[in-house]
Amino acid sequence: METFLFTSESVNEGHPDKLCDQVSDAILDACLEQDPESKVACETCTKTSMVMVFGEITTKATVDYEKIVRDTCRGIGFTSADVGLDADHCKVLVNIEQQSPDIAQGVHGHLTKKPEEIGAGDQGHMFGYATDETPELMPLTHVLATKLGAKLTEVRKNKTCPWLRPDGKTQVTVEYRNDNGAMIPLRVHTILISTQHDETVTNDQIAQDLKEHVIKPVVPAEYLDENTIFHLNPSGRFVIGGPHGDAGLTGRKIIIDTYGGWGAHGGGAFSGKDPTKVDRSGAYIVRQAAKSVVASGLARRCIVQVSYAIGVAEPLSVFVDTYKTGTIPGKDVLTLIKENFDFRPGMMSINLDLLRGGNFRYQKTAAYGHFGRDDPDFTWETVKVLNPQA
């Protein structure tokens, strides 16, 4: 039996790039909560003792950017310089301007356009992917890496492992078999966890706690065997972390945000962008389309691409591939997708309820993946049952 190895990584919410994603989306939440028509393109960067937010925002909302930055950093656990950043004493820089009027008139017609007429906020192409290898219809490598990162944060915040600090990375290698285009996970080959820790803990304690409190509750026992390799803090020391260890920037973890290297990616990041930015809304609707194809039993694996031109409402192209796993011809799958999903930006915002912010709606997406999450706010995970015409 021919097998292959595939690897996906994740980082948890204390990683500097992910801190930036969460700040950008916390600002988006604040804008949309007060003004659902807000136009937001918010970037964040961070380094030792400093967080800067910058970009273009046009909104009627009253937003205290500095408070949002400090609250978000504090919520992650950055409460002292020792752990990588002090939320209450770091410098916060803000350089926010309004959206270019050239873009505004081309996309929104200065808000005179009906929802179905609203053009894409930029050109670009986005991909959605789904696979039947997990209940989430997501790749197992990505699911495990992401859940290990989330569990690291959980046992840090609930004090199960009080030696943990906010920054951390995970990586999972799975051995697969290709079953005529469908992916069959056989076993977990390697688990890698690198987590920030305090000065007092020993490497033996780190390894013991990670196996017992992080890996054991997350990775199903049937995937582990005597040959599974564990690299637990292989560098030996990870005390300095967060923005003190590395600079961070919004939009630098786009593979972690999506499918862990499976499928494809058009290159556009998600966080800090309102739904007129098709980098985000387009990627959400093609995930819903691909997931619906697999959940409806039309294929075991599916990828969907959509593309846009700035200022144009209708997509330029829609593509689907079922990797030879389809139960009906590919052209029929494409027809069903076009009949059941409206790819115009204004309609995606309505159909997926994307103009609703606040209550951490978008901030939640900015750590532990945008897809495969069991949360009613992740409206794009709702399956539409697709019935082929007899």
UniProtKB/Swiss-Prot annotation:
<feature type="binding site" description="in other chain">
    <location>
        <position position="277"/>
    </location>
    <ligand>
        <name>L-methionine</name>
    </ligand>
</feature>
<keyword id="KW-0630">Potassium</keyword>
<feature type="binding site" description="in other chain">
    <location>
        <position position="15"/>
    </location>
    <ligand>
        <name>ATP</name>
    </ligand>
</feature>
<keyword id="KW-0479">Metal-binding</keyword>
<keyword id="KW-0547">Nucleotide-binding</keyword>
<feature type="binding site" description="in other chain">
    <location>
        <position position="99"/>
    </location>
    <ligand>
        <name>L-methionine</name>
    </ligand>
</feature>
<feature type="binding site" description="in other chain">
    <location>
        <begin position="252"/>
        <end position="253"/>
    </location>
    <ligand>
        <name>ATP</name>
    </ligand>
</feature>
<feature type="binding site">
    <location>
        <position position="9"/>
    </location>
    <ligand>
        <name>Mg(2+)</name>
    </ligand>
</feature>
<comment type="subunit">
    <text>Homotetramer.</text>
</comment>
<comment type="pathway">
    <text>Amino-acid biosynthesis; S-adenosyl-L-methionine biosynthesis; S-adenosyl-L-methionine from L-methionine: step 1/1.</text>
</comment>
<dbReference type="Pfam" id="PF02772">
    <property type="entry name" value="S-AdoMet_synt_M"/>
</dbReference>
<dbReference type="InterPro" id="IPR022628">
    <property type="entry name" value="S-AdoMet_synt_N"/>
</dbReference>
<dbReference type="Pfam" id="PF00438">
    <property type="entry name" value="S-AdoMet_synt_N"/>
</dbReference>
<keyword id="KW-0963">Cytoplasm</keyword>
<dbReference type="GO" id="GO:0006556">
    <property type="term" value="P:S-adenosylmethionine biosynthetic process"/>
</dbReference>
<feature type="binding site">
    <location>
        <position position="269"/>
    </location>
    <ligand>
        <name>ATP</name>
    </ligand>
</feature>
<feature type="binding site" description="in other chain">
    <location>
        <begin position="167"/>
        <end position="169"/>
    </location>
    <ligand>
        <name>ATP</name>
    </ligand>
</feature>
<keyword id="KW-0808">Transferase</keyword>
<feature type="binding site">
    <location>
        <position position="43"/>
    </location>
    <ligand>
        <name>K(+)</name>
    </ligand>
</feature>
<keyword id="KW-0554">One-carbon metabolism</keyword>
<feature type="binding site" description="in other chain">
    <location>
        <position position="246"/>
    </location>
    <ligand>
        <name>ATP</name>
    </ligand>
</feature>
<feature type="binding site">
    <location>
        <position position="273"/>
    </location>
    <ligand>
        <name>ATP</name>
    </ligand>
</feature>
<dbReference type="InterPro" id="IPR002133">
    <property type="entry name" value="S-AdoMet_synthetase"/>
</dbReference>
<dbReference type="InterPro" id="IPR022636">
    <property type="entry name" value="S-AdoMet_synthetase_sfam"/>
</dbReference>
<feature type="binding site">
    <location>
        <position position="277"/>
    </location>
    <ligand>
        <name>ATP</name>
    </ligand>
</feature>
<feature type="binding site" description="in other chain">
    <location>
        <position position="56"/>
    </location>
    <ligand>
        <name>L-methionine</name>
    </ligand>
</feature>
<dbReference type="GO" id="GO:0004478">
    <property type="term" value="F:methionine adenosyltransferase activity"/>
</dbReference>
<dbReference type="GO" id="GO:0006730">
    <property type="term" value="P:one-carbon metabolic process"/>
</dbReference>
<comment type="similarity">
    <text>Belongs to the AdoMet synthase family.</text>
</comment>
<protein>
    <recommendedName>
        <fullName>S-adenosylmethionine synthase 2</fullName>
        <ecNumber>2.5.1.6</ecNumber>
    </recommendedName>
</protein>
<dbReference type="GO" id="GO:0005524">
    <property type="term" value="F:ATP binding"/>
</dbReference>
<dbReference type="Pfam" id="PF02773">
    <property type="entry name" value="S-AdoMet_synt_C"/>
</dbReference>
<feature type="binding site">
    <location>
        <position position="246"/>
    </location>
    <ligand>
        <name>L-methionine</name>
    </ligand>
</feature>
<keyword id="KW-0460">Magnesium</keyword>
<feature type="binding site" description="in other chain">
    <location>
        <begin position="235"/>
        <end position="238"/>
    </location>
    <ligand>
        <name>ATP</name>
    </ligand>
</feature>
<comment type="function">
    <text>Catalyzes the formation of S-adenosylmethionine from methionine and ATP. The reaction comprises two steps that are both catalyzed by the same enzyme: formation of S-adenosylmethionine (AdoMet) and triphosphate, and subsequent hydrolysis of the triphosphate.</text>
</comment>
<dbReference type="InterPro" id="IPR022629">
    <property type="entry name" value="S-AdoMet_synt_central"/>
</dbReference>
<dbReference type="InterPro" id="IPR022631">
    <property type="entry name" value="ADOMET_SYNTHASE_CS"/>
</dbReference>
<keyword id="KW-0170">Cobalt</keyword>
<keyword id="KW-0067">ATP-binding</keyword>
<dbReference type="GO" id="GO:0046872">
    <property type="term" value="F:metal ion binding"/>
</dbReference>
<dbReference type="GO" id="GO:0005737">
    <property type="term" value="C:cytoplasm"/>
</dbReference>
